[in-house]
Amino acid sequence: MLSIRWDWGQYGDLQLGDYEKARLWIERIEEMSQEGGFLEGGARGQGGEARARNSVPLLKARYIVETEEWMVLPVTEESSNNELLATALSAAHTGDQQALRDAETSLRERSSGEGEGTGIMANEVSALLHAGMGHADVAKRFMDEAVETIEAMAPPRGSASPIKPVYELYGEILLDLGEPEEAVEKFEKSLERMPNRPRSLLGLGRASAMVGDRDKALEAYTNLTRVWAGRDSFDGYKEAMSYIHSTENN
């Protein structure tokens, strides 16, 4: 249960924009796994240390994805699937095509021998790669495959899985491809599965504003400012407030 607590705890702090506390979760788990922070024997003995060590890459990868503080990590055989996805997203946003290709290759190789979760992440990364190359139809085909897989699954009850939700990423890709109408649908679906998720609210606000749906954009941006209350320094918060103020003057 301890691993669930730090998993959900960090995720919750990230959604609220408390990035300092989210980093603290990582530091604490690293200290506990490296400096004998677990009791000898029992559930919190060696097993607890192993769970802590295995959780660190997940927490670090999630931090990169949620904060969008992009970091391209080396792609190696030891890279976890979550690290590969975080690296692929970072590479896509920073223009590192080689790192993006390397991450895609690794996830594709693993997807044939692992569960559906790896296949979903592989499709997400393939979509990022082809979207960046201007292959819109190919990118959407990969995302459609990812959607088909997750639709057979129940919505997450805790933290997002994969760490970059499929519908959210699909919406962001569609925005980049200049298809805001379709993006609106994807962000709405993302919010059905994970209500009030800030990155999906931000995407819905942007897409709705682009298609001229003022009411929907205003609702999404307003909800975002509530989730990120007090996060005045966030670019997304500033964007939301700017839109809200613009509607007050019209």
Predicted regions and their residues:
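TPR/TPR-like (Sel1-like) alpha-helical repeat modules
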Residues: 13-32, 92, 105-108, 147, ...
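Amphipathic alpha-helical segments of tetratricopeptide repeats
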Residues: 27-38, 105-112, 144-155, 185, ...
